[in-house]
Amino acid sequence: MTRLEGMAVGWGGLIASIGLLIGAERGDLTRAVAVAVAFTIGGFLAGVRAESLRPLHAALAAVAAYAFHAVFVVFGHLASLLGGPASPSFVPGETRTWVLTAFLGLVAAMIGGGIAMAWLRPQRADHRRRRDSRT
C-alpha cells in the first residue's frame, strides 16, 4: 500500500520556499529563476525522500512551500512591528505574475519529482540490485 510521507513533503517544501524568499522583493525575472531552481531542487528532494508517488510528493512540496512562505511572512511582519526590517509581501508584484510564478513553481517541482523517479528504482524484495540492461 502506498502512503503520503509528510517528511518528504516538508523537506521539499522547505527547500522550495527558499526560492520564494529569495525572489520576494526582486524583479520578475529574478523571482522566476529563483522559484524555478528552488522548486526543482525541492521537488527532487521530496521525490528522493518518498518511497512511491514521487511526482505527487513533489507537487505537495510545492504547495507546502507556499504554506512555509506564509509563515515566514507572518514572522517577518511580527519582526517589523517590533522594530525590525520591513517584511516581504506574500503576493509580490501583480496577481497575474504571482499566479504564473506559482504555476512555474508547480511545474518545476514536478520536473524535480520526475527526475527523482527516473533516477531511483526500488530494490527487489531480496534486497539485491537489479542489473541495468543498458550496461
Q: What residues fall within each predicted segment?
A:
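Juxtamembrane/disordered regions of integral membrane proteins
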Residues: 1-135
